[in-house]
């Protein structure tokens, strides 16, 4: 059995998957915030419960926000303070007497989608998250590409390309990002960026769901806004696709629930790609809230 943990600032979620990649059991507990020992205990107790329930010693994979293992072997995860700065993988491997694998939550999202029954035919899968921020992951032949510092797939911290500034205007604001840089694309393409763009052009502070509702009602202002957003997304994604050249792009995050994105994006991409490039298949993520657990469990699928 494959045990997948999706760990965040408020909850530890465990999903148990069989050899057919089907979810057999899941359980959630609160994430301890102040005690590393309590954090380790919470994970180990869930593993023990799963081992007993299924009569086996399952493999353990963990998805967690941040950098799973820095050069000194410690975790960097600002949203999980009890474990940040600790040698989490080594400590859990020792306590559980098995190989525990860690990766960041965006890679686990991408891995979950790459192992969808229909999507396994594609060698290179790119996950793109359009949510509170913009991120994602790359999966090649069923395994995540992490990079030296686990920042592969941090697409949101690419800067606006020159074509975007030409389209939006050279006086377009280069917003300061939480990473300390200016002009990172997640400030314009995330759910918050979607709302910011609307306010910037129309001086109305609406949230993304409100704007989308107006779009669905045929509101001309909202429709013009969505056209502008999709054009900007296509410009930025075109740069990424020129570097990565994936077979499949799977879009997740809150904005993936807006059908216009997956329905209209592909037609806008060719003008931003090399003439010989082929537009990849673009799909909405299929596994929702279970994706983090699925992807973490599947860290053990290919060795």
Swiss-Prot record:
ATP binds at residues 4-11, 133-140. GO terms for molecular function: ATP binding; N-acetylglucosamine kinase activity; zinc ion binding. Keywords: ATP-binding, Carbohydrate metabolism, Kinase, Metal-binding, Nucleotide-binding, Transferase, Zinc. SUPFAM superfamilies: Actin-like ATPase domain. The keyword ATP-binding applies. GO terms for biological process: N-acetylglucosamine metabolic process; peptidoglycan turnover. Zn(2+) binds at residues 157, 177, 179, 184. Gene3D superfamilies: 3.30.420.40. Signal peptide: none annotated. It holds the Pfam family ROK. It comes from the Bacteria. PROSITE patterns: ROK. It catalyses: N-acetyl-D-glucosamine + ATP = N-acetyl-D-glucosamine 6-phosphate + ADP + H(+). Its EC number is 2.7.1.59. Pathway: Cell wall biogenesis; peptidoglycan recycling. Catalyzes the phosphorylation of N-acetyl-D-glucosamine (GlcNAc) derived from cell-wall degradation, yielding GlcNAc-6-P. Belongs to the ROK (NagC/XylR) family. NagK subfamily. This is N-acetyl-D-glucosamine kinase. It comes from Escherichia coli O9:H4 (strain HS).
